[in-house]
Amino acid sequence: MFKVVGKLLQIGEKMLLGGMQGMERVVQSDIYPPYISLVTGPPGSMKSSFCMTLLTNHLNRTGEFGLYCTVEETVDSLMRGATSLGLQLPMNLQVTDFTELRRENEDMDYLKFTRKMIEHFKQTHGDRFTTFVLDSLGAIYSLTTVDEAMRKKMFSFFDFLRSMNLNVLLITERNLGSHAELQGNEGFLADAVINMGMDHRNGKLVRTMQIEKMRHIRHAMEKQAVDVGPHGLVVLGPLFD
């Protein structure tokens, strides 16, 4: 079904992409802030699990501070998901959900609120605050009108994220079979696009990861098989037809 190839590089223990076992076979070097990555894919493709694996293992090793914001899922649900992956969320990870805020204020400006939260934690933790995950852009789009004004807001939001000097993982939905049909202009603005998916192989459903775009970094573009290991997701190796 798949073949494990030799390592493309050696990833240092404290690198963000080193938080997922097997990524050393896929990328030649790590990403350094400011860097914005889109994590895309259909429902059930483990986008959140991918981000939580990278973030949790990285923060456990480095002692840096990270922020995970979820628009739809509660903190309790995320924690149960992390436990099922074998991940122990560190104290230096702040998980915040917007579910209560959404119920209280239907007209809430989520991008503005997120900016204020990032600014707060940057003031509190300084350069120790290195990593941010937003789960998800699709949820924010579903709660707002996607028009020219929203696209300008998104452009400004990406500029803001870069100004905060963070490694950023933005989760967004993508339907099965589509290549780059994202809802706004974020596909052009992001430094990397990592597509999570599912393939049918030998009568089984295999979860996959594929790097479609990654600026400044040499990377393999083959579709990779992924599975749950002892400490979150792991890359098993490339899939071949």
Question: Where do the language-model regions lie?
Answer:
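Structural motif
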Residues: 38, 131-135, 169, 194
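Conserved nucleotide-binding/hydrolysis micro-motifs of P-loop NTPases
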Residues: 72-76, 99-103, 137-139, 174-178, ...
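C-terminal regions of RecA-like/P-loop NTPase motor modules
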Residues: 1-13, 220-241
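Phosphate-binding/switch loop-helix module in NTP-utilizing enzymes
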Residues: 102-164
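Conserved P-loop
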Residues: 33, 37, 42-108
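Loop/turn-to-beta-strand initiation segments
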Residues: 65, 92, 127-131, 163-171
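Pre-Walker A adenine-sensing motif
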Residues: 18-30
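Phosphate-binding/switch region of NTP-binding enzymes
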Residues: 167, 172-232
